[in-house]
Amino acid sequence: MLFNFLQKNLCKAFTFNMTSGHCQQTLATLFRSTLLLSGDNTKLFTPIRPQSWTCVLNYFIYLLCSQVTPETMFKDIVSFLQANGASSACWVLPLNFTETRAPKQQVSRLPSKWKILTADGSPQPWQVYWGIPSCLAYASYVGHLAEIATDWGKVTETNTQELLNHIFDLLRIFF
C-alpha cells in the first residue's frame, strides 16, 4: 500500500525499492545523490528540528514502514507538525521537484505587502506545484500549517481505517 502511494505521487522525483524480511520493512529512496533508508527496527531520523524537506520525508517514510499502530503514527505526525510548523525549510519542495515547470507569476503582479517564500534564498513567486495557492503570504503559509496541526491534534478517531485515511490525507497535503 505504501509503495503504491509513493510510486503514484512521487515517482517523478524518486526511485523506490522496497524489501521485507525478518519482520522488517525497509524502504530506500534515492533523491539526487541522497539515499534515504527507513525500517521498523531502527529509527534513522529523530524529529527535533529537521533541516530540510528530505528529512521530513524520511521521517514520514519511517513511520509508514514501522510496525507502529495507526494511532501512534497519527499522533507522531501531528506532534511533528506542531513542533515544526514554522520551519519553511521543512515544507518547501525543491524547485526541480517536478519534470514540468509551472508557469511563473510575474513578481510585479504580487501585492507588495505579501512576502514571497523562497526555497534557495532568491526571491521568486510561489509555484503552483508546491501544492498550495500561488501568491500566498509567508505568514499565511505558516499560519496554515499551524492551523492544520491544531485541527488534526483534536482528532480523537479510534477507527483504524479512518486514522489511516487521515494519515494519507496529511501526506497528500505536503507531498
Swiss-Prot record:
Domain of life, per lineage: Viruses
A Pfam family matched in the record: Herpes_heli_pri
InterPro entries on file: Helicase-primas_cplx_Herpesvir
Protein's name in the database: Uncharacterized gene 41 protein
The encoding gene: 41
